[in-house]
Amino acid sequence: SDSDDCLRNRCPQYNNCFYFDSRRQADKADIIIVNHALLLADAASMGMILPSYDLLIVDEAHHLPDVATNAFSLSLSNRGLRALCTKAIKKVSAPAGIIHEIESQGFAFFQHLNQSSTYARTRVRKPIEEAAELADTLHLLKRWLEEQTFENYLDVDQAREKAKLKAKSIVSTLNAYLTLLDYLANPDPNWVIWIERSDLSGSRIAVVAAPLDPSTYLRNQLLEKDGLTSSVWMSATLATVGEDPFDYFKRTIGLDKVIQSQVPSPFDYAHQACIYLPQRMPEPNQKEFLPRAADEIERILEVSEGRAFVLFTSRASMNAVFDMIGQNLAYPCMKQGDMPRLKLIEWFRATDSAVLFGTSSFWEGVSIDGDRLSCVIIDRIPFQVPDDPVYEARCDALKEDSDGRSWFKDLALPHATMRLKQGVGRLIRTSTDTGMVAILDPRMTSKAYGRAILECLPPMRIVRHLDEISLPAKSKLSMR
């Protein structure tokens, strides 16, 4: 059996089933540990996955808005539609005529999507008429399934029951597809819709709808969950710029009536680390920036004797700088993509004076303590580029906001602050670590928002000249 035709307590193997035995143990447990994806999948399913709970503690809570956006999203792909048709024929003997009509309308629908999209992800801004035509054929299958009693399964009651469960599962998938197609035919301003394709041929193409503001769903299906009396949200990067450092996070997940607190770090940042902000760097949008950044990175690595993460906001910038200096460095050097992520981390830990060039996946979730990592170099303030349809739509909504909110102040800036704090946080992992963070973006000092971001970073000494930093004979960086 699979989840579609599981008979649950009517199955003769129910008492021996690993899944239900795990569920029974979870029901008895005082503490249940799950990841963010499972927590939000339970919320999206209206509590059908996890046992009831009265206290929720969420670590690394800054991820919740993005996880929630994914959890409450809807998706329809050409491969998914084909799989549904195959399932309907094999599992419940759906009429060939209806399936043929779905396949025909589906082909026309996805062909239109492929011709309408010019990028890997293309936002949909206008109604798509073909969506209504595909929806009409899906309704035919749904009505047929809802009318079936499966009385032809006369030999085995269990087979009839499994067929009913399969039909119910297919109807559930159809309902999700029909909701998405309705958003395509009749756009809803509260939803963001885009087309994704794997290549120009459209061998895999999908349309996705995501909530513009997931806080409504989080509030209704998680924060106000029956039985939940209180919740705790923790992260080293929740606080951002502004009078209320937690305002951005509270807005994105729908929190109110909170008791909030910033707990001091156990690390002595003033003595363990410094932030190097080089002078006279070009603006990041100037063509001179990357060559100057490459020169500055070489100088910094000479001081740190390698032992560095060099973090970029884009793969293109990483590759460009690596091509400029990677072969000339006096230290073992690799970049993201040279091998799988975990292998790169293992290589870094095992290699003396290693230098690792990386992008988004190395900004967080990597912990290198001790002498192996003495320096973290960041190319620029990590403002999100507006090629993400959800981010673009949220910026557009704030530009039209009548409450005086700003897309930059209320979205772009706090998001970048959180991201920068994550990158900076790679350096000091224990009370004995020391080292240097270098941020090559001149806006950290030339712009008011850059100085505001700087105030949100750990209280490290600010250094403007590399000769203010000296390297002890053994180990890590110290400040004169």
Regions found by a protein language model. Give the residues of each.
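ASCE RecA-like P-loop NTPase motor cores
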Residues: 1-480
